[in-house]
Amino acid sequence: LVLALSNGFNLYMARMQTDTLSAYPLSISESSIDLSSFNEIYESDVAEKYPELDNVFVQSAFEKLIGMLKSNDLSEEFLTYLNEVDPELYYSMQYDYGFDMNKYIFTDISIDSETPQLRVDNFMAVDTVIQMIETVYTMIGAIPPDLAAMGVSTSFVRSYVPTMAEMPAKQLIEEQYDVIAGTMPSFAAEDYNQLVLVVDSYNNISDITLLLLGYIGGSMEIGKPLAESFSFDGTAEISFEDLVGSKFYLADNAAAYPYDDVRKTYKNNIQPSGADTSAFEELEIVGILRPKENVTGVLDTGLAYTPALTARVLETSEEAENRAIIDAAKNSEKGSVPVLNERSGQSTAMSVRTLAGDPTPAKISIFAKDFDGKNAIKAHIDAWNAKYTEEDEEYIAYSDMMDMMFGMLSTMVDAVSYVLIAFTSISLVVSSVMIGIITYISVVERTKEIGVLRSLGASKFDIANVFNAETFLIG
């Protein structure tokens, strides 16, 4: 019974792993942390417990923390080798180039605040809108002092406000999502301007997300409970027709970060609503996606774009008018250039990578089709690593979060199973001994009955069968 339960739970975990395979892809990052050695940080370097010495020993925790940091050289040679993996093993090999698409996609936003007096009616990047929301949280004291003391800041807003996300391969999206309005984007290079809106299984999407993405104007009143801080013209439902066809705008570096000749600095592009958008490329929502039943989708709710849009941003960054800010960052001593946010008055350091000026990927996410495929891909990378040691620059460290998480869970289940099997075995031994004792006592106490049976012609074999039957029934 215990083995059956253990086997059943292992099968359940395997099914869970299959369902969540796309949520935790195999990843290779330019820089990463080796979580597998996390438990070693506070392991003692002293061999003997409770030493009889008048000394305090210092652990090398900082050195171990530094040792957990891994750098990968995602060279052209390795990328060529990685692309030799059989395409039938994975849905998509997604490249992240280290820039935020939210800084390049613009929308009209309308916010009207009574306390303090604030009227925002601008054409700006989605990322700038997120910064405004973070500022509002600061102004209304949304972070309790006890949480602030623990290091919690308004940056958590970004993790709760899904904005722009890149979709992996079309095949994976078609397997996990239904198109409930409009069409599925083509994923072709020339159709980089196609976006989709992703809703949850209830057709829900956050009202804050709608505000950030500029679907409808909002009224924001500082000091009200957070649940009442935003109101959208009394509209609780929006038809598919109003959403499909919504326009957004793609900026290149020259449009996103114009140079201010007066202040001699680059700045975020913020214009009045209805401003000239001829310097921008038009994007359009072509469909609405909803996850299929019993499927853990790879996308969060919000807007999603195809890899073709990423390729388009990298392509435009190579044009002469867009290279100025990239060259300024490349030629600076710090490797970055300050960009002024006129609304907050603060500057942000932008590097070559965050300006979409580096065509080398910062992270690679591989969405395997199944476990056999994932293991084959890992074996392919291991074959590359076999030529090097972990200290070599060419050695590639990859992360398999799902394997680590379920591996720990499987170890725990195995440990519980071993304990239960041990208890069961002990119970079985004790029961066998007790049955033997009962049988022995039964034979000793029933000698007269045995004598009667023998006198009636019963053989020893017949009498043994009687007692064996009783023992079997007792057992």
Where are these regions (language model features)?
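Transmembrane alpha-helical interface segments in multi-pass membrane proteins
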Residues: 419-430, 439-440, 448-475
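Solvent-exposed loop/turn and edge beta-strand elements of beta-rich ligand-binding domains
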Residues: 1, 66-72, 137-153, 344, ...
